A protein has these predicted regions:
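N-terminal presequence-like segments and the immediate start of the first folded domain
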Residues: 4-9, 14-86, 90-106, 112-167
Length: 167
C-alpha cells in the first residue's frame, strides 16, 4: 500500500513535468504549400502559452513638412503600413515581446483614390515585407487583409491589429 506522502510526491513530480513540457512546447507555423507568400497558412499555439491582443493601430504623421491634415502628411499605403508596424513593434517591445512573436494579424485597408478606390495591396506588402519574412525576422503570422469603406480619419489607409504569444 502506498503512503500518502509517496502519492503526493509522485503527483507533484508528474505535475511539474507536465508544466515544463507545456512551457517547452513551441509555436508551430505551417507554411502555405508550394508558395513563398509571406504569411503562415496556420499557426498552432501550445497550451499554457499567454496570448497578447494588441488593439488596432493607425498611421502617425510621416511627413511633418506636409500641410497639416493633408494626405501627404500621412503618406501612401506603404508609408502608412510602415508607420503602423513600427508602432506595433514598439508596443510589443514595451511588453517584452517582438514582431517574431506575432501569430495572427488582421489588416484593414481603405481604397486609395489614386487607384480608383481599390486598396493598394502591393504598397501594403512592400511595408509588411520589411517586418515579416526577413532574414532577421523570418516568423510569419496567419493573416487576413480586408478592404473596408473607411477608417476614423478619412486620410488613414491602414489599420492593423495583432495577436502575439509570449515565448
Amino acid at each position: 500500500m502506498f503512503r500518502p506522502a509517496v502519492i503526493a510526491a509522485t503527483a507533484a513530480v508528474l505535475w511539474c513535468g507536465s508544466v515544463a513540457a507545456a512551457q517547452a512546447a513551441k509555436v508551430i507555423r505551417h507554411k502555405i504549400p508550394n508558395s513563398d507568400f509571406p504569411i503562415a497558412a496556420a499557426v498552432e499555439v501550445p497550451a499554457g502559452k499567454a496570448t497578447v491582443y494588441v488593439s488596432g493601430k493607425v498611421p502617425a504623421v510621416v511627413d511633418t513638412t506636409a500641410p497639416k491634415g493633408s494626405a501627404a502628411a500621412y503618406g501612401d499605403t506603404k508609408a502608412q503600413t510602415i508607420s503602423v508596424l513600427a508602432q506595433i513593434k514598439q508596443q510589443l517591445e514595451s511588453l517584452g515581446l517582438g514582431m517574431g512573436d506575432v501569430v495572427k494579424m488582421q489588416v484593414f485597408l481603405v481604397g486609395d483614390p489614386a487607384m480608383d478606390g481599390k486598396m493598394d495591396f502591393n504598397g501594403f506588402m512592400e511595408g509588411y515585407r520589411q517586418y515579416f519574412g526577413t532574414k532577421e525576422q523570418p516568423n510569419l503570422p496567419a493573416r487576413s487583409a480586408f478592404q473596408i469603406a473607411a477608417l476614423g480619419n478619412p486620410l488613414y489607409r491602414v489599420e492593423i491589429e495583432v495577436v502575439a504569444v509570449r515565448p
